[in-house]
Amino acid sequence: MSLSTIAEVKTFLLALQDRICTQLAQADGSAVFNEDRWTREEGGGGRSRVLTEGAVFEQAGVNFSHVSGATLPASATAHRPELAGRSFQAMGVSLVIHPRSPYIPTSHANVRFFIAEKPGEEPVWWFGGGFDLTPFYGFEEDAVHWHRTAERLCAPFGEQVYPKYKKWCDDYFFIKHRNEARGIGGLFFDDLNTPDFATCFAFTQAVGEGFLEAYLPIVEKRKTLSWGDHERQFQLYRRGRYVEFNLVWDRGTLFGLQTGGRTESILMSMPPLVRWEYNYQPAEDSPEAALYRDFLPVRDWLKEPE
């Protein structure tokens, strides 16, 4: 694989970060992203961008990183012995958006590329990524729009792509110690290296570029709804589930913290405010109860009317 090919992936990722930040700032209308450029002693660096205290977004972080090293840590090669002794590069864009309104869902997306090389041998490479939605108050039309957008971007790559990566997302973003989903899912893929580089890169681009198409219409539709302290307290309580998943189960967070990654960028996904409540139970037939009953269980949203 040529250096120009790797550079093409990096160019796409940098432009994607720019585009997402620009459109999120426009949707917010009052706040801007502050950029923090950083370098990694072992190789590489990145640029972390965070918007705080906006009119629409309480906090939004969009991070680009490109790190490299002469060898991978043992934790990375334990299940992939073919990576031992190889130099590596890993690059990606990762974002988490925590809206101010409880009626706008939290959302997460990332796209990433990994390559490990050794003189005289073929490189080992793959793409990964996806996006998922975590509502506090469910709206069926939003869930249908989210999943139909995901299905449309997958369609050119095969009819089995959406159901495969939808199921992977449902399985991955599951909080095992709570026995409940983090949200309503979306797409999740990893270790993608077939049928060829061009197809894998094109799919990864489609996912990255499709995120705002899926998310921003929901933001625009819900940002003018009025809400009060009751809804805010439930939002803060449900944010606790987000924290629990990221710190206990998320592979990317754990890998970054265990391998000396940049902590500020890794924990950029944390919400600015959160609360826990012992043995909370939503009132029967309340909008809060509807989240648990109608939205967190796995559903085929494509069967619902748009």
Curated annotation (Swiss-Prot):
A Gene Ontology biological process term: protoporphyrinogen IX biosynthetic process
Location of the region described as Important for dimerization in the Swiss-Prot/TrEMBL record: 242-277
GO cellular component: cytoplasm
Keyword Cell cycle tagged: no
Residue(s) at site: Important for dimerization: 177
Chain residues that bind a divalent metal cation: 98, 108, 147, 177
Cross-referenced Gene3D superfamilies: Coproporphyrinogen III oxidase, aerobic (3.40.1500.10)
Assigned protein family: Belongs to the aerobic coproporphyrinogen-III oxidase family.
PANTHER family with a match to the protein in the record: COPROPORPHYRINOGEN III OXIDASE, MITOCHONDRIAL (PTHR10755), OXYGEN-DEPENDENT COPROPORPHYRINOGEN-III OXIDASE, MITOCHONDRIAL (PTHR10755:SF0)
Protein name: Oxygen-dependent coproporphyrinogen-III oxidase
Organism of this sequence: Serratia proteamaculans (strain 568)
Gene coding for it: hemF
